[in-house]
Amino acid sequence: MKLSLAPISLDRYFDTDKDMRTILELTRDCGFTYIDYDIKQKYLDGDYIEIAERLKKNLTELGITAAQAHAPIINPFNPGEVDYMDAYRKSLHFCQIVGIPRIVIHAGCLPDNTKEEFMANNIAFYRSMIPFMEETGVEILLENIGHYADSYYLRNGAELRELIDALDHPMFGACWDVGHANLYNKKDCEQYSSVVALGDKLKALHVHDNCGYFEKSYRHHRIDMHTIPYVSLYASVNYDALMQGLVDIGYQGTFNFETNAPVPPVRFSFEYEGEIVRKLEKLPIPLWKQMNVLLYDIGKFMLETYGLFEG
């Protein structure tokens, strides 16, 4: 199994369009030759074809493979001013140009919708994209998202598989988000059984860690942290359960990290003598590289332990 990285933490260092090659070079320097490419809405609002062609050229020259992509996150049932169908059509075309075989497109929800309403609405939504999917040849992956405060019903592998099966089209598959799954109580979501339930529909992973689910009386809050495995005292994803599931289903995709370290996405501001101080807001790039070299080594250890690592 190949290791992969979604280099989203570099969004805070660089212009993801103008500095595209630099981002790819840094990712490769950490050991990763497979990536999960994040398609920005700003690309789709401009000359996205030129950006896609340039990305393809850079990937080829640098020896990097984009095994999967992520579309802009838009709630199709409350899209605001965004034309979500146009955004998703362009996202699929973007992938077609670059040669990315599959893309994650999130489901949507309405406040307090029932499970039946959630399923019916999303079946109609995803089926509306079948013509674009067939035209481009790019698979659409559904991802498990949400937590107990939301009205999403993709809490575990069985529910995700239920929606995919209802779509009844061979080009729909699953992206299992390991960290999202960890936000639920184990009785509602468990890594091994979820991966097994997805079976041959599982095409991609988002691997990251968090503090998981705690009862409301506990001192920690649930939060989608996207941290590196093993670095937090309360990190609680059971990677043995995940890995055994991948082994048992013969998973063929990449082991893709979607970590947002070492850049903190949220930080209270500090003002001193009338100026906002940001000296320690983020690590310098050499330290970013060291941390993500460590991430690669952690992934290699995990895969080698289960006999899955492909150099």
Residue ranges of predicted features:
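Histidine-acidic metal/acid-base catalytic patches
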Residues: 1-7, 14-31, 60, 99, ...
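N-terminal substrate-binding region of glycoside hydrolase catalytic domains
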Residues: 26, 31-46, 70-73
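Residue-level detector of anion-binding/catalytic polar loops
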Residues: 33-34, 65, 101, 139, ...
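Glycine-rich, proline-tolerant flexible connector loops at the mouths of alpha/beta enzymes
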Residues: 36-59, 113
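Active-site acidic/histidine proton-transfer and metal-coordination neighborhood
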Residues: 58-61, 77-174, 183, 279-282, ...
